[in-house]
C-alpha cells in the first residue's frame, strides 16, 4: 500500500534526475554536431542567432570525457572576444546553460553539476522530508531545466533561490521522516 507507493515515488524522482542528465548529454552532442540547429531551422524555429554563437563556441571545446573545461567565466571572455573581433554585433551570452557549464567546467564539472542538482538534492529532500518534497523540487526544476537548454537562467538569483526556498518552506512545516545520512 502506502509504503509501496512511497517507494515508487522515490524511484520516479531518481529516474527523473537520471533522465535529465541523459537528456543534457544528448542535447550537448546535438548542439556540438549542429544537428539541433539544423532540426530547429528545418521546422521554421527562429533561433535568433543562438545557432551561430553555438557554432563559434565549438572551436573552444571538445565533446569528450577528457575535456576538463576552460574555467569559470571563460564563456563570458570568449563571447567578449567574438564581439571585439567583429564576429558578433552584440556581446550576448550563449543562451545555453548546459553548453556554458560544459565549456567552463568540462566533462567532470557537468557531471558533478547534474549529479548535485538532479540526484543529490532531490535525494536529500526525499529522504529527509518524504517524496512530496522531492516531487515539489522537480516540479520547480523541470520547467527551469527546459530554459537551461536555450537561455541563461541556471545562475539567475530568482531561479536558484526559488528552486531552494519553495521545497525548504515545505520542509519547515513537515516533520523529518529520518536522517538521510
Report the location of each language-model feature.
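Transmembrane helix-loop junctions and nearby membrane-interface residues
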Residues: 29, 121-127, 148-155
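Structural signal for the C-terminal ends of transmembrane alpha-helices
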Residues: 1-7, 118-127, 169-177
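Juxtamembrane/interfacial segments around transmembrane helices
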Residues: 16-25, 66-77, 162-169
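Hydrophobic transmembrane alpha-helices and their immediate junctions
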Residues: 104-144, 168
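Transmembrane alpha-helices of multi-pass inner-membrane enzymes
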Residues: 137-147, 152-181
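A membrane-periplasm/extracellular boundary helix in multi-pass inner-membrane enzymes
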Residues: 2-43, 59-62, 72
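Long extracytoplasmic/lumenal interhelical loops at the membrane interface
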Residues: 41-105
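Helix-loop-helix junctions and helix-breaking kinks within/between transmembrane helices
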Residues: 1-4, 29, 33, 105-109, ...
